[in-house]
Amino acid sequence: MPLYEGGPLTQFTAFSAGVIPNDVFGVAINWFVNRTPLVSRLPKLPAGSPQFLVTNDNYRPRSNPMNNGGALSSAAASVTVADATIFDVGDVIQIDQEYMLVTGTPDSGTTTGNVLNITRGYAGTTAATHNDLLPVYLVSNSRTGAEVNVTSVSRIPQAVTQYCQTVQHAYQVGGALQADANYVTGFATPLDRDRMLAMQHVMDDFESAIYYGKGVPISQASSRPLMKGISNLIQTNNVTSPTNAAAYKPSDLVRDTLQASFNGGGNPTVLLVSTDFLSGFAVWGHAAMRLQAGSNVFGTPIDLFEAPFLSGISIIPAPLLRPGTVICLSDPEVRIRLKRPMIDKPRGSRGDAFEGDIITEGAIDLDNEAHHAWVTGVTAFAAA
């Protein structure tokens, strides 16, 4: 049944990825599955320290600009690029219509700086003069079939430090209020009202930090660590002033999210959208269609949509996202790391009052930031 699909589509993965939530967290994950979709639906894995590293793999780019200091003449046997470390001996490169063979690189010890030794007019093309700053395209590497002692191309992953954040909200209720029975709404909650309010405040704060946290480390005893949110973890495809922001069209959405994620090497599966995008889909003539994603244990349907022009991409409305915001995720690379799953810590009775705290500690873990996209600043929508 749909409840057991993978990805941040339902709350099932929150229960089945390494951390078994205790009772109060299980209640929160289910009760707030639509209000706080990432906290509720993403897989949960343990974190054993106040901070951890988020890994961004660093593969060879397919192009690099010339940095020759002038035009490359048709007779030149070397070229300077912006970053020669991405190239290897035997690489076939292309500038304009000319193909060239790389015969020497800094890593092989045959050149220095960012200089490449090249064979001109390779593969039947003609050597020509090329203007500086043109892109140097990496076509492919080609070997003789009997080479030895090949020097590897080292691409060291980028590691970003993420900080576990503690969120804590108290509930305090007097005995007289606890004894009142005529103010409760007909929509019952799993726990008493004050405890549920504290639980919602914790879930709201944690979800909002996942979006907008800036990152504050532990530097002294009085530090208040803050996780880095998705808006700060995503650097490559982070759009804050989108083209056509006041007349945003479906093509703009695809360009800023899906296309950007694919270009970065990702496999986008989910769009998390602010609620105004639901109106945007209607303006575009592609109203979001609800999918049957099951319901939580309390019988509430789980919000999950698709739009006709985004077939196969799940759309999840996120009430706590600011207007004009959309997040595109390659969901297998996103998870919640918990140092302390949500706990209910009663302080007990004090006089004629009952008190306690709802506490959780953790952070978002998002691998390979170039595989995802963040867009904000959309102010109005226009038909395609």
Q: How should these model regions be labeled?
A:
Residues 55, 75, 80-82, 96, ...:
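A structural detector for beta-sheet-dominated domains
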Residues 2-23, 46-55, 304-306, 314, ...:
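Hydrophobic, glycine-enriched assembly/anchoring segments
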Residues 154-253:
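Alpha-helical scaffold segments that mediate packing/assembly in large oligomeric complexes
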Residues 50-64, 244-342:
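Extended oligomerization regions of viral-like shell subunits
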Residues 4-129, 382:
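Autoprocessing Asn-cyclization modules and mimics
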Residues 106, 122, 275-277, 319, ...:
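Short, flexible loop/turn elements at secondary-structure junctions
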Residues 7-16, 99, 108-175:
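Cys-His-centered catalytic/binding microenvironment captured across papain-like cysteine peptidases
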